């Protein structure tokens, strides 16, 4: 199903109007993000204004600001607002940096980075998600550059990146990260190994470290694995 295809509302339910969506965004920020140690005022301000409802199917518009992930296409979701805010804050974004958003889906996080002043390459493998993401970013973050391709390969054409951001869960760190990240770059995402819960992480290169990256575990979270992220195409860290 096309994410942006028209879908009838359940009988008796109507979509909220623009002021109600604005109120829902304020409640999301004040009730979900601020009490959960989201302290970056830039992120809080942008999430008060980016219309997250445009990143999901019309029948899910009214749930766009709920504290839950929302289905997009089979196996893909729009992460819950708090998870996105926590990961973006952990990425320590700085204006002028170049970020690769892997699994950019319908473009919400890519647009968030672009509005923070970063140069954004959005990598997605699903053409339906790309269509929605391009439309969303054209309206709200037109500088985002979209690429279609396997997520496990990154995008060497636009490398190097100061930040590689996985907008979903991976089973291991893909090998492309070592080749496409700058010498002082950072990687942020969710990692699931074995039967454990996925865990958010931040990884950086450090001279003299015995492995390619020094990894800092952040917090446990829930998200499905991104496509084509098989452990055999990656390395341990």
Question: What are the roles of these predicted feature ranges?
Answer:
Residues 58-60, 200-202, 230:
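Short aromatic-enriched loop/helix-cap "lid" or pocket-rim segments at secondary-structure transitions
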Residues 65, 108, 161, 165, ...:
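Aromatic side chains
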Residues 92-214:
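Conserved nucleotide-cofactor-binding alpha/beta core module
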Residues 2-102, 108-112, 116, 129-138, ...:
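Class I SAM-dependent transferase core
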Residues 227-237:
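Short, surface-exposed secondary-structure junctions/capping segments
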């Amino acid at each position: 199903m096309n994410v942006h295809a028209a879908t009838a509302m359940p009988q008796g339910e109507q979509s909220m109007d623009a002021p109600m969506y604005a109120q829902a965004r304020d409640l999301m920020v004040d009730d979900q993000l601020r009490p959960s140690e989201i302290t970056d005022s830039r992120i809080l301000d942008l999430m008060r204004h980016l219309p997250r409802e445009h990143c999901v199917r019309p029948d899910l518009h009214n749930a766009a600001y709920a504290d839950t992930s929302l289905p997009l296409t089979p196996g893909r979701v729009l992460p819950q607002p708090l998870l996105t805010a926590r990961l973006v804050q952990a990425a320590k974004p700085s204006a002028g940096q170049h970020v690769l958003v892997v699994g950019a889906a319908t473009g919400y996080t890519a647009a968030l980075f672009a509005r923070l002043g970063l140069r954004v390459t959005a990598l997605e493998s699903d053409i339906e998600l790309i269509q929605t993401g391009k439309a969303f970013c054209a309206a709200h973050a037109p500088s985002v550059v979209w690429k279609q391709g396997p997520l496990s390969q990154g995008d060497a054409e636009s490398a190097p990146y100061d930040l590689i951001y996985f907008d979903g869960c991976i089973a291991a760190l893909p090998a492309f990260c070592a080749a496409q990240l700058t010498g002082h770059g950072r990687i942020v995402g969710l990692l699931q190994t074995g039967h454990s819960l996925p865990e958010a992480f931040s990884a950086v290169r450090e001279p003299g470290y015995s492995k390619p990256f020094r990894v800092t575990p952040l917090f446990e979270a829930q998200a499905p694995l991104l496509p084509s992220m098989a452990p055999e195409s990656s390395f341990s860290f």
